[in-house]
Structures are given as C-alpha cells and as structure tokens.
Amino acid sequence: MSGHPSGIRKHDDNECSGPRPPVPGEESRVKKMTEGVADTSKNSSPSYLNWARTLNHLLEDRDGVELFKKYVEEEAPAYNDHLNFYFACEGLKQQTDPEKIKQIIGAIYRFLRKSQLSISDDLRAQIKAIKTNPEIPLSPHIFDPMQRHVEVTIRDNIYPTFLCSEMYILYIQQMSAQQERCTSSGATGSGSAGSSGSGGSSLAGACALPPTTASGKQQLPQLVPPGAFINLPVSSVSGPPAGTCSASGSVYGPSTSASSSGSISATDTLPRSSTLPTLHEDSVLSLCDDFEKVQMQEGGGSLGSGSVGAGARAPDYPIRLTRDLLIATQKRRLEIRPPGAHGYVYNPSTTNTSYVPNSRVDSERASVSSGGRTDSDTMSISSCSMDGRPYIQRRHSSTESKAIRQSAMANKETNTFQVIPRTQRLHSNEHRPLKEEELVSLLIPKLEEVKRKRDLEERARERNPGAALLTNERSSASDRAFAEAIREKFALDEDNDQDILDQHVSRVWKDQTPHRSPGTMSPCPPIPSRRRTATHDSGMVSDGAMSLSGHSMKHSKSMPDHSSCSRKLTNKWPSMNTDSGISMFSADTVTKYKDASSRSGSSTASKLEEAKRRLEDEPRRSRRYAQPPMQHLSQQPLASFSSSSSGGSISLPHQPPPLPAKPPETIVVFSFCEEPVPYRIKIPGTQPTLRQFKDYLPRRGHFRFFFKTHCEDPDSPVIQEEIVNDSDILPLFGDKAMGLVKPSD
C-alpha cells in the first residue's frame, strides 16, 4: 500500500485477478477494485475452517460434532467413551430439575463403571455420599474435573490426527467446491457486472477460502498441517466452474512461474480453469509459442479490441481440447516428456516400487502370450521363388518353431515368480550388538517372568504335595514298564561260533546221507533262542516254541525234519516272525506233520533206539551248549505258552485294555454374600486358578474373591484369603476350595 500513493493496491500473481461478485440487491452499482479487496478481508472464514483453530470451535458446531464422531467411531474407537462422557457432561450442565440431575448423574456413573475411563477416589466417595444421604444438594458440575481431564486427552491425542485425516480434508474439499459452485451460479444469474470497464480479465466466481493478507498469502487456521487443503483441486468433486482464482492463487498455493527476468509467468499463459495442465515428472512448466498462438486464436473472437493488453492474457473461460491444439503442442509435449517414460506406463499405485527391466524369460513369455511370430511363421508357403527354400524345409521349420513356442513355458526358469516380501527381508540394524543398558532392559523382564512362574509352581507344590508325589510315581511306573517291555522285545542272545559250525555240518551231512540209520544219527544242535523267539502280541507261536515244550522228537528217515525247514524259512524270511494275526503253522503243514507221525509210529524199535540215544547224549549236549542266564529268562514266558506236537498253535490270552483314568478334578464350594445356599462346581485340574473359577461363576460383574485357608497363627488357624490376580492358584481347604464372593463397590 505504501508503494502506491493513489491508494489502489496492485494485484500480484498470488491473488484473485478480478473483483468479488456483486452482493444481491447491489447489482446496479459497479464496485471498484478496492471494495472487492476490502470485502475479502472483512468476511469471516467458513465454519468448517474454524474447526482447526481450537477444539471448542469443533465441538460447538453441529456439523463438526457429527464429523468428529464419525471419525472417532471409524478410526479411533478407543476414544468413544471419552467423547460420549464429554457430551453427557455438557448435557448435564444444561439441566435445572434436581430429579433430572440425579438421574443423569446415576446414569453417567453407571456408564463410567462399565467404560474404560478411570474414576478418581474423590469422585467415587462423593457419589456414594449422594446415594446414601439424599439431603446433600446435587450439582450439575460434579464431573467437571474429570471432564477437563477428558478434554485434555482428546485435544492432545485424537484432535490433531483428526485435522490431518483424509475425512476432514475431503470434507473441506467438498464444501469449498459446493460454495464456489453456488457463488458462480449466483453471479451468472445476476449478470456480468463490475468487469466490463476494468480493462482486464475478471472472474465469474470467487474463492471460498480464508481471507488473504496484504502480502498476498493465506491466513491459514491454526493446527492445520501444511498441505491439508491448499493443494487439493476443487474440481475433483464438482465440474469446473465458470471461473475461479488463478492457477497460482490461493487454491493451489504459490505458482510455478518463470524467472524474474521479465518473462511471462505461468499465470499469464495458463487458461482460467479450475484444473491445471498435466506437468510431467522431472520437467519444468514452460509453454511454447505455438501453444500461445493457438490460445490467442481460441480467445480472439470473444475478446474486444481493448480487452487484450500488451501481455496478451488468455481468455477467462477454459479452452477446449481440439485437434489443432494437439497438433500445435505435439512437438513441445514430446520434448518435455521425461526420457524414462518412453515405453513405460506410469502407475500411481506403484510409484514407490523399483522398476526392473524385462529379462529374457519375461520377453519370451510376453512374445508367446501375445501371439508373436518368428520369421519362419511369416514366410510364404505358396511359392518357392520368395525365399529359395523348398516347401518341405519351410514346413519343417514352422513345425519346429511351433514346438519351441509350446515348450517355452516348460523350459522357463523356476524361480522367476519367487518374491521375498519386504517385511521378511533382513536388515543390518536388526543384527547390531545391543548396548549394555538395552540388553539389561530386555533381559530383566524375561527373567522376572521366569522367576514368577517358578515361584507359582513352587507354591503349588507346597500346597499340594500329594499331587506331585502321585505324578512322580506314575511317571516312574510308566518308565519301568516301558523298560521291561523293551528288554523282553529285544532280548537277544549272542550266537556261539560252535553252534553255527555244528548247524552247518549237520545240514551238509543230512543232504549227503539221507538214508542214515537212526542209531548213528548225530544230535542236531539246538537252535539259538534268537531264531526261536515267539511273538507275544497276537497269539502267534513259531516253531521255536514248539521245540521248547519238550515233546518234539527226532523222527526216523521217513519223517521230514520240520525244525530244519522252519529254521531255513526263519533265516530266509525274517518277516514271518512279525505280527500278522495268523498262526505260522498252516493247515497243510499240520496235516503233513500228523501223517508223518502216524507213519513213523509203526516202528516201535526205532522209537526205543532213538529215545535211548537221546538220553545218552543229553548230558554231553547240556555241557557243550550251555546257554547264558539271560537265555533261560527269555525262554520262560515262551515255554508256558508252547503247544504240544499233536496240536496246532495256541494263541496267547488276550488281556482287555485298562480303563482310561478319570481326569483329575477339583471341587470348589462358594457362595454369594446375599444368598444362603452355596454353589458346588468341579473345575478340571488339581491346581485351578482364579481365571478358571471366574469362568464358572453364574453371574457377571465386579466381585472380590475370598477363600478359606489354613494359617500358622494359633489364635486363628483358619482365615479368609483374598485372591486378586487371575493367574494365582486357589488355596485348598482339605481336598476342596471354599470360596466367598463379595460384590465390589
């Protein structure tokens, strides 16, 4: 103002270049430029912009309260109780009826007990005194200290995030566009007054934003973050209005103008529309001469001879996108396009991701998927004069190319689609050595937690020593049974070298002299117990068990050596000793054995001779083939279940499975203070906690829990102990827990 003695302030590029629209009723009077500026500075900002000044402006406005409640419900539900309590206190202050005040105070107090807000002891005592003594006067300001505390919490925590939220910014954008549209429509209906005699271009609409100062900058509300609504295009909600502020005005912030050496700024060359032209990344806004010429041609017909000054300003209406304009600006648009943009489409959703060039496999895959053809596919097959190759060779080449394309996906790299998420990548700062203070701060809580768990276990063992002893006995008994079963199952005897040699010699001589005399037959060495171990689990008895009964006999030459056969089968197929649920003796084998026994029974002399020889050789055999003590122990259970030579196999007695043990339970007897009849429940486990006990309560609410327990004090050996922590174990009185539940105030 001081630089212009005439009192008329010069408009720069950061302000509206035309006067405000006429006030209804004053359309006939043409205003000066100074009046339009004065009106802009005097008018107050809209209410939705005042919400950013203080929290009181927001909570005193109806629309602001609705928007703030919606934001809290969607974005910060933890502050719902704070907001509801604040408005409940505001409603309480407006009441004058004592009865209404008493009801509202009781309702607010019940709400506070159920909410997450903490109630001070003074307030709790004051409300209890009001309930017990109705003569105490009720004050609607009883919750004022707590309301101030809640207000501070809202102002410090949720109010700043609301001002930066997308919901509030979008609301400002919509309201600004709506106000601008209404202003523009009102100015169009009342006529284009106040701009014809100014000698320059004017605006058909006005800026519905905060007032500007003399320096040309916005007066932004307090607590609004930069860019909250300064860089938001208004046309995103509504269509472009007939006119608005310049492209570098208050809506879009400072302009990107040319240098100050006298060149034309971007404001002078851009069209007067609510949207800016596209400005590519890594480029400077600059318009060529062809664009200016086309712009002047578009606006030349509607502008008068005196409306276009020396600066050749653009018309005030938005120019249309025509063919001539695209052709005129084609060269310049290609020049200002960034080099990296050729052949690459920018996606706004992937602006923060890195660009990786196509690999060989990706190129082949894209070529195959798009139906790309090779040179052999495009060759002519109608004539041999085109390429000089015969038809068969061209057909063979085409077939090979087709096969290559079909197998391209099978020959691709296998790890092309393996993407490691960014959240799972290792960072260097995660493996840095911790300082001593950080290590102590992280280690102490963990050690305290371990110590607390051990203390709880120790207390539980002290209170219930019988359960620990029972558990130890069960574990030791199960370990002993398991060890015995393993020993019985895998009890193996070491093979004697002499036994192996004797068995080999007996097999060789038996094959060479099949018709030997019974009197000269040498005794067959006994089979080691490892090869005659019977299976105990399914009642299946092997040949070894048959030989242990003492009834098996060596028959004459007409009787087949069944033990040797079984020994061969056992050595050749070890799986025959496995549990199959079927006896190892088939019906055919038993029948053949019985037939052989009946045929050999006719020779009484041979039987007597064989018995005499066996009795003579028995002492020598027992001394020669002495078995270790472990062998006799392993044969005892087998001999008791062996069968006779004339019968088949006898299955072992099947023992029924033991009944499942009843899970341990703890009986808890408790009662409420106002009920004479106690409750009796069963909680699974021997060490129930308070949390488990709460789950079985028939009521829900705030209670205190007392349990009867023993005390070392001789005057009062039985006391009521209060349990507070949910993880604490309930004390037992005898073999059950005796509890008393009291409602908490």
Curated annotation (Swiss-Prot):
<dbReference type="GO" id="GO:0019901">
    <property type="term" value="F:protein kinase binding"/>
</dbReference>
<feature type="compositionally biased region" description="Gly residues">
    <location>
        <begin position="188"/>
        <end position="202"/>
    </location>
</feature>
<dbReference type="InterPro" id="IPR038207">
    <property type="entry name" value="DIX_dom_sf"/>
</dbReference>
<dbReference type="GO" id="GO:0005102">
    <property type="term" value="F:signaling receptor binding"/>
</dbReference>
<feature type="modified residue" description="Phosphothreonine">
    <location>
        <position position="513"/>
    </location>
</feature>
<dbReference type="InterPro" id="IPR001158">
    <property type="entry name" value="DIX"/>
</dbReference>
<dbReference type="GO" id="GO:0008587">
    <property type="term" value="P:imaginal disc-derived wing margin morphogenesis"/>
</dbReference>
<dbReference type="InterPro" id="IPR044926">
    <property type="entry name" value="RGS_subdomain_2"/>
</dbReference>
<dbReference type="GO" id="GO:0005829">
    <property type="term" value="C:cytosol"/>
</dbReference>
<protein>
    <recommendedName>
        <fullName>Axin</fullName>
    </recommendedName>
</protein>
<dbReference type="GO" id="GO:0005634">
    <property type="term" value="C:nucleus"/>
</dbReference>
<dbReference type="GO" id="GO:1990909">
    <property type="term" value="C:Wnt signalosome"/>
</dbReference>
<comment type="function">
    <text>Inhibitor of the WG signaling pathway. Down-regulates beta-catenin (armadillo=ARM). Probably facilitate the phosphorylation of beta-catenin and APC by GSK3B (zeste-white 3=ZW3).</text>
</comment>
<feature type="region of interest" description="Disordered">
    <location>
        <begin position="339"/>
        <end position="401"/>
    </location>
</feature>
<dbReference type="Pfam" id="PF08833">
    <property type="entry name" value="Axin_b-cat_bind"/>
</dbReference>
<keyword id="KW-0879">Wnt signaling pathway</keyword>
<feature type="compositionally biased region" description="Basic and acidic residues">
    <location>
        <begin position="607"/>
        <end position="620"/>
    </location>
</feature>
<dbReference type="GO" id="GO:0048468">
    <property type="term" value="P:cell development"/>
</dbReference>
<dbReference type="GO" id="GO:0030877">
    <property type="term" value="C:beta-catenin destruction complex"/>
</dbReference>
<feature type="region of interest" description="Disordered">
    <location>
        <begin position="508"/>
        <end position="581"/>
    </location>
</feature>
<feature type="region of interest" description="Disordered">
    <location>
        <begin position="183"/>
        <end position="204"/>
    </location>
</feature>
<dbReference type="GO" id="GO:0031625">
    <property type="term" value="F:ubiquitin protein ligase binding"/>
</dbReference>
<feature type="domain" description="DIX">
    <location>
        <begin position="663"/>
        <end position="745"/>
    </location>
</feature>
<dbReference type="GO" id="GO:0030707">
    <property type="term" value="P:follicle cell of egg chamber development"/>
</dbReference>
<keyword id="KW-0597">Phosphoprotein</keyword>
<keyword id="KW-0217">Developmental protein</keyword>
<dbReference type="GO" id="GO:0032436">
    <property type="term" value="P:positive regulation of proteasomal ubiquitin-dependent protein catabolic process"/>
</dbReference>
<dbReference type="Pfam" id="PF00615">
    <property type="entry name" value="RGS"/>
</dbReference>
<dbReference type="GO" id="GO:0005737">
    <property type="term" value="C:cytoplasm"/>
</dbReference>
<feature type="domain" description="RGS">
    <location>
        <begin position="54"/>
        <end position="172"/>
    </location>
</feature>
<feature type="modified residue" description="Phosphoserine">
    <location>
        <position position="522"/>
    </location>
</feature>
<comment type="subunit">
    <text>Interacts with ZW3 and ARM. The interaction between AXN and ARM occurs via the armadillo repeats contained in ARM.</text>
</comment>
<feature type="compositionally biased region" description="Polar residues">
    <location>
        <begin position="347"/>
        <end position="357"/>
    </location>
</feature>
<feature type="compositionally biased region" description="Pro residues">
    <location>
        <begin position="654"/>
        <end position="663"/>
    </location>
</feature>
<dbReference type="GO" id="GO:0035019">
    <property type="term" value="P:somatic stem cell population maintenance"/>
</dbReference>
<dbReference type="GO" id="GO:0007455">
    <property type="term" value="P:eye-antennal disc morphogenesis"/>
</dbReference>
<dbReference type="GO" id="GO:0048477">
    <property type="term" value="P:oogenesis"/>
</dbReference>
<dbReference type="GO" id="GO:0060090">
    <property type="term" value="F:molecular adaptor activity"/>
</dbReference>
<feature type="compositionally biased region" description="Polar residues">
    <location>
        <begin position="366"/>
        <end position="385"/>
    </location>
</feature>
<dbReference type="GO" id="GO:0007450">
    <property type="term" value="P:dorsal/ventral pattern formation, imaginal disc"/>
</dbReference>
<dbReference type="InterPro" id="IPR029071">
    <property type="entry name" value="Ubiquitin-like_domsf"/>
</dbReference>
<dbReference type="GO" id="GO:0008013">
    <property type="term" value="F:beta-catenin binding"/>
</dbReference>
